[in-house]
């Protein structure tokens, strides 16, 4: 699940982890969004300029600011945007993992 949104969710998580210092799980637990502006890869290959979907826990101020800037914002159900998992092996051999809490579809398991 995810189609054209997967790469967007992964990029948001990656930037949070690499540039904003969030750990694996914090980056996944933070609010997610995706754009529907570009032509879809799958039939019927729709393009919805200016449209985006965002989770409500980003806050009303952010949602209002996006709308003021002309975005067509759809507010999704809480914890419903994005499906992510991540794993990291530290230089000391420690394995770290994280899984999205969204829709209870993922687990982080290591050995």
Region annotations inferred by a language model:
Residues 1-78:
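Proteins synthesized as precursors that undergo proteolytic processing into mature forms
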